[in-house]
Amino acid sequence: EANENALKLASFHTGRKKVVAFSKSFHGRTSAAVRVTDNPNIVAPLNEGLDVEFLPLNDIQAVKEALKNKDVCAVIIEGIQGVGGIQVPETEFLKSLREVCSATGTILILDEIQSGYGRSGKFFAHQHAGIRPDMITTAKGMGNGFPIGGVLISPLFKPVYGMLGTTFGGNHLACSAAIAVLDVMKGEKLVENAATVGSYLIKKLNAFPQIKEIRGMGLMIGIEMNEPVMQLRNSLLFEQKVFTGASGTHVIRLLPPLNLSKQDADLFLSRFNNALNS
């Protein structure tokens, strides 16, 4: 819902219809959000009307070519791709993307729904690159499981009453939950903890010779293996009692709680080692 509103506002503001998104992206399952998701299997014929061009992540020349005619209303990109396998946009790419969007009057939308709220070791993942988008979409961690979403909108946009609406964006109970989340995050220094424990975990995982590549930031980590991970995940779950996510066939996705301690990380590493060698 947050991404739907962001895309809609970008189109209202620019008067344009086309959107640029990136390969392996995931932005949602409804209407415009599913159309800018790079998975044709979940895009129904009903959703196909939106003009979307998918470009390779980190290919700034492709972006410049796509935006040169100044007919694109928005570029939407995840702070870190989650479903796509924990793909981290390069810092220089994000900086150049900001410049190209500004030069062509294109709205830059940062989807921080999975990568935001401290997950990456900063409040929003794009802050690692030091850029300022035109809109930031957020949900998931915003309510710590309680349904709520939101769009952070630049002063560039002039609000018009009734232009946008949400089901999950403004009810009193959800907002109370979101405020409580912020209080706990600040009081327990969870963003700093995600950075510290995440760096520790990534360093330790890089020592495993069986792993092809480690990607991610903070406590948003992708473990790419040389072989399919189904058997490894089953061993972790049923034998080691460790639940993990996945992306595709070869990537284990780690999204642990932001209060994960080094002791918790060591326990995971021990059980991960057991599963690898079982």
Task: Give a label for each model feature.
Residues 1-278:
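Conserved N-terminal phosphate-binding loop of PLP-dependent enzymes in the Aspartate aminotransferase
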